Amino acid sequence: MNAKRIRGLLIFAAVIAIAVLIWRHFTQTSPAAPGTSEQHAARTSHSGNNSSGNGGGRRAAMRTLAPVQAAVTQSASVPYYLSGLGTVTSANTVTLRSRVNGQLMALHFQEGQQVKAGDLLAEIDPRPFQVELTQAQGQLAKDRAVLANAQQDLARYQQLVKTNLISRQELDAQTAAVRQAEGTLKADEGAVASAQLQLDYSKITAPISGRIGLKQVDVGNYITSGDTNGIVVITQTYPIDVVFTVPEAEISTILNAQKSGQPPMVEAWDRANQKKLSQGTLLSMDNQIDATTGTIKLKARFDNLDDALFPNQFVNIRMKVDTLKNAVVAPSAAVQMGNEGRFVWILNDKNEVSKRQVTTSIQYGQLVVVTAGLDADVKVVTDGIDRLTEGAKVEVVPSALTEKTPAIAGEKS
């Protein structure tokens, strides 16, 4: 019993001690609260000052002029180009075939080789044709002798009839015999010429100048004049043509360009429209419009001496049809599109901006031709446009576009 009482007293004493320690702790820290409040006030005051400073900075920033870049419009001569998609086509394409039947004895070309008209390309076994020629020549010689004999007899008959040693009927018969022999001789001469022609055909030559394709038959095969694939295909690449299309609305423009006396200049560009491949001239225009596409076909011719164009190659075409003289040219970056159409921001002498509606026609690279609403030597904004308002004053910063750039070409936009 005494042990339990002692344990209870110890627990009570421990609780009292803990309570005293807690009380002393709070009584020692509570005087620091005013200092803390002062520090908090100081921080609050400092924060307020910063807020005030930031507000002033924003107001100062609002008073800063919006930076823009500008360029000056100019008057220039701008070539007017029509664009189209085209396919390179050979000026002439020939499937080389034999004109006679026989065994192919030799091929005198390499695949992909450039050949000239008249070059020997293949040979057919000539022996059968040489035999036919010899026979025809022999028959010709025989009938020539027959004719000579008939002519001599006719000369004698003409003398004898004068002395009445032969009848007139015999003279007429001999005259007919001579004429018959002459006819036979002409037939023989034709047979000789035909045999000679067949022999000549055994040597196959290039009918045009061009590039040899892949051979369609090997040496040793028996070929005929009716073979569909022939021996090889020759395509003429010097010069070469491009067939392309333009909208039917441009027909009058093209016809006017042709009336100038010089065929319009045509440029061929690669598939990506990044590299100029060759330059030629317009050759011809089709005589009807494609009702399905509303376009018309045109053909241009290129020298192609550097083999830049290849048959069936896809190219982009630009054809010069006119030159716009004294056209007002502005950077295309200055022209914007709004609800009311195209417009630009112009700068006055006080660097104040104002919006002006414009009409444009053709464009090339960084330049666009302005046909209405803008004159030459006017300063227009090219960058920083999204920050502009009517009548706002701006700060013009240097730009590469502030220097005049010569207009060199144009396309319809």
UniProtKB/Swiss-Prot annotation:
It is a peripheral membrane protein. SUPFAM superfamilies: HlyD-like secretion proteins (SSF111369). Residues 1-32 form the signal peptide. Its main location: membrane. Pfam families: HlyD_D23 (PF16576). It comes from the Bacteria. GO terms for molecular function: efflux transmembrane transporter activity. GO terms for cellular component: efflux pump complex; plasma membrane. InterPro entries: CusB_D23 (IPR032317), Multidrug-R_MdtA (IPR022824), RND_pump_MFP (IPR006143). Residues 32-46 have a biased composition (Polar residues). Transmembrane segments: none annotated. Keywords: Cell inner membrane, Cell membrane, Membrane, Signal, Transport. It is found in: Cell inner membrane. Residues 32-59 are annotated as: Disordered. Belongs to the membrane fusion protein (MFP) (TC 8.A.1) family. Part of a tripartite efflux system composed of MdtA, MdtB and MdtC. PANTHER family: MULTIDRUG RESISTANCE PROTEIN MDTA. NCBIfam families: PRK11556.1, RND_mfp. This is Multidrug resistance protein MdtA. It comes from Pectobacterium carotovorum subsp. carotovorum (strain PC1). The gene is mdtA.
